């Protein structure tokens, strides 16, 4: 029973799709961290500077309810997350477009077909006849 499960898992794990997916998840996670850092540490401070030294991390709205309790809406962090999402989405779009262009080039290449057994035999006979002349 356990041996069958292990064998089935090996077959699944060795398939290209499972390995490709695992590599994609790891690379995607690392790429997400890079883009998050780009947005938080470079883009948003520059945008904040252009908008009059606004710090997006601290942008918030405090709402007081009727009973006096306060709710803080941190919309600055939300704006950063939206910019983060847009950059990641656009980067993935460009990457997929690049991969698709490579696939199209591969599809456009004419495939050289392997000669059949008969064609190979005829070519050998032709070569022998040329040599005998």
Curated annotation (Swiss-Prot):
It is found in: Cell membrane. It is a multi-pass membrane protein. The chain crosses the membrane at residues 19-39, 79-99. Keywords: Cell membrane, Ion channel, Ion transport, Membrane, Transmembrane, Transmembrane helix, Transport. Disulfide bonds: none annotated. Its main location: membrane. Pfam families: MscL. InterPro entries: MS_channel, MSC/AndL, MscL_channel. One of its GO terms (cellular component) is plasma membrane. Gene3D superfamilies: Large-conductance mechanosensitive channel, MscL, domain 1 (1.10.1200.120). GO terms for molecular function: mechanosensitive monoatomic ion channel activity. Belongs to the MscL family. Channel that opens in response to stretch forces in the membrane lipid bilayer. May participate in the regulation of osmotic pressure changes within the cell. This is Large-conductance mechanosensitive channel. It comes from Clostridium tetani (strain Massachusetts / E88).
């Amino acid at each position: 029973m356990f041996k069958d499960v292990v064998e089935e898992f090996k077959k699944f794990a060795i398939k290209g799709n499972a390995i490709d997916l695992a590599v994609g998840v790891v690379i995607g996670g690392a790429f997400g961290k890079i883009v998050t850092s780009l947005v938080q540490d470079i883009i948003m401070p520059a945008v904040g500077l252009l908008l009059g030294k606004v710090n997006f991390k601290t942008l918030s709205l405090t709402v007081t309810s009727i009973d006096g309790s306060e709710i803080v809406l941190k919309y600055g962090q939300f704006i950063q997350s939206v910019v983060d999402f847009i950059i990641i989405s656009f980067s993935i779009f460009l990457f997929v477009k690049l991969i698709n262009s490579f696939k199209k080039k591969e599809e456009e290449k004419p495939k050289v077909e392997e000669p059949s057994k008969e064609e190979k035999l005829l070519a050998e006979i032709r070569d022998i006849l040329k040599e005998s002349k």
